């Protein structure tokens, strides 16, 4: 995402939280931990999440597989949600050292 080599990523650690914090330090990344069908779907549909963070310790393999499938198959709705994502991107660009 940050370098443009990939459109999306999936990170898995104990809770999914540490990976999420680290991923969100990379410009252009919008990462969140998802733990159920609704968070996986809405993270894409309303927030255009491009990095899915999952817990290996708290979720079964069956649930992880299902969440990945939902997340990969769900499209961003755009519209009013796109404006919110643009605001987030604007804040990010103002916070980066290069200003870009």
Explain the meaning of each model-derived region:
Residues 1, 23, 43-44:
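Hydrophobic residues within well-ordered alpha-helices
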Residues 1-8:
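Short alpha-helical segments enriched in small residues
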């Amino acid at each position: 995402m940050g370098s443009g080599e990939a459109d999306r990523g999936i990170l898995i650690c104990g809770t999914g939280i540490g990976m999420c914090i680290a991923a969100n330090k990379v410009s252009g990344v919008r990462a969140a931990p998802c733990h159920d069908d609704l968070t996986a779907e809405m993270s894409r549909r309303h927030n255009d999440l491009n990095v899915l963070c999952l817990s290996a310790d708290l979720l079964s393999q069956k649930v992880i597989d299902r969440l990945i499938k939902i997340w990969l198959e769900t499209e961003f709705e755009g519209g009013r949600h796109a404006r919110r994502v643009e605001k987030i991107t604007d804040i990010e660009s103002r916070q980066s050292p290069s200003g870009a």
